[in-house]
Amino acid sequence: MISRRKFIQNTGAGLFLTAIPYSTNALNNIKKYELTAKKAKHSFEKNQNKTDLWLFNNNCPGPLITANKNDVIEIIFNNQLDEPSAVHWHGIRNINSMDGVPVLSQPLVEPGESFVYRFPVKDAGTFWYHAHNKAWEQVTRGLYGPLIVSDNDQLKEKNDILVLADDWLLNENLQMDVSSLGNLHDWSHAGRYGNRLTINGVFKPNIEVFSSGQARLRFLNTANARVLKFMLNDDIYFRVIATDGSPCNPFKTNKIVLGPGQRIDILIDETTKLKHLKEVSTGNELVAATFEPKNQSVSVLDFNKKPYYPFPSLNNAKVINIHMQGGAMGNLKSAIFNGERREFRN
């Protein structure tokens, strides 16, 4: 571990202050980025109060990191927080020493220090990165961002759309309810839920899509506890083509469910069908985003990827039943409220 000042003196890293790749080695395909964790302010919607958050490079979500399959990614991580941190590369089949697990695979990056992550990306898919010390607080405050590995360099030329979702527990002034961070009641039950939903760091954004052709939507749930459920428009069907960064045998559905940290890629055959994205996990339909067509068409997307690994035989599989009960009171089926019994299960 080295200090920020010494690191800059030795490497000249002070010249590179954004998360945009600042050089590419043609022989080794090294994509270089710099991420700085610090306190920052962010507006979830125009003309509203700015919220105090902890962010990478002052962005919510953090900057998009892109690479091609078999590239090497090099990230200079600078910690400008008042407490230690580290960065985990969620879903990447990584080198153990670069996986970002404090104490186990690396020392904590102390305030004012820097750490260089350098690892190959072996798989194309949808991934993300996030703080990995006190994640229940640091990730909740905004320290995360998307990481997309492509099979080619045509990511920006395609109807390839990121849908990064998070829920935030905010007060009437749009400030975080920091008093609830680390709440043991939440931990022992279903976790700390938020009361406001963002897509790509914004309340109910307009998402641009090409006016015709296919579209790939990359869904990513960065909430720390909430299981999210999405549908498009009024229940139109689409194809799931990848889960957790790996292509799958495509199948049709009209809703997707994402647990915390989960990613699902879907394919829409015709973007003219896209109107609204709705979150429906509570039983109510909440419009999370609106799709806005732009006058450009796109050719057929290349999504016919085979799963990376063959499906194992289940002939001699050992069956293990896992009961997902949701923590304390997870088995509660009903309760009496105001003298009336209310059922919790349909």
Predicted features along the sequence, with ranges:
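C-terminal segment of N-terminal export signals and the immediately downstream linker at the start
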Residues: M1, A19-K46, K50-D52
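Hydrophobic or amphipathic alpha-helical targeting/insertion segments
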Residues: Y117, V121-S150
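N-terminal edge beta-strand
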Residues: Q48-T66, N195-P205, G330-N346
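Asparagine-centered strand-capping/turn motif at beta-strand->loop junctions
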Residues: F77-L81, F219-T222
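Acidic-aromatic/histidine active-site loop/patch
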Residues: D160-G213, L220-A223, G327, K333-F337
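N-terminal export signals
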Residues: K6-A26
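Extended terminal and domain-junction accessory segments
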Residues: L27-E34, V139-N171, S246-N346
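Extracytoplasmic beta-sandwich strand-turn segments characteristic of Greek-key/jelly-roll folds
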Residues: C60, I65-A67, W89-D123, F203-P205, ...
